[in-house]
Amino acid sequence: GGMPFWLAMVVVPLAVGTMGLVVERFLIRPLYGRPIDDPLLLTFGLAYVVVELVRIVAGKQGIPVEMPEALQGAVDIGIGFFPIYRLFLIGVAVAVVAGLWLLLERTRYGLIIRAGAQDPLILRVLGVQVARVWLLVFGLGTGLAAMAGFLAAPLQGAAPEMGIPVLAEAFVVTVIGGMGSIMGSILTGLGLGIVEG
């Protein structure tokens, strides 16, 4: 039963990304202009609310997620055997990072996002609808987080609290890597992954 893996890989990020749009519009947006602690605490608190809601709906044990047959097993990469699913994860990660980099560095929309992160007032002066930009950024971020959780599920099961440890790590990566630096965040994330094994 359940939705096929490949379909769910598309549907889950879209559904959660849409929920992210609603959260940004009605919960996060009223806090813009306030100290950064306020939206930060709200999103941390919201994460715990979501965990409890998932526990109520899906149970405390979580749900086992089976990886597709095509991604099971291992392949010889010359220095030993490596799980096919982990190679698939590396491929997806590279594709997502490349897509984000192209979006932020090579498009007008990316220029607006980067400018807004530095000085939102300039964008308002230029007539850019900053609220719409942040709405789409938040939706994209929640969608990508959902994809990461979905892809991790076959390795550890879809448990209600599976995202909580990642919250702290994401915060560390953002702070050390630099708020506006995608390359800094990538390198910090890679470093953290290597340290954790």
Give the ranges of each region predicted by the language model:
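Membrane-interface helix caps of multi-pass small-molecule transporters
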Residues: L21-P30, V57, L102-R106, L151-P154, ...
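Transmembrane helix-bundle core of multi-pass membrane transporters
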Residues: P30-L31, I36-R106, V130-V133
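Alpha-helical transmembrane segments within multi-pass membrane transporters and channels
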Residues: M3-L46, L53, L187-L192, E196
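Helix-boundary and loop/linker segments of multi-pass membrane transporters
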Residues: G2, G33, F81-F82, G127, ...
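A helix-boundary/kink motif common to multi-pass secondary transporters
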Residues: P4, Y32-I36, Q118, Q129, ...
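Helix-loop-helix "hairpin" substructures at the membrane interface of multi-pass membrane proteins
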Residues: G80-A159, I182-T188
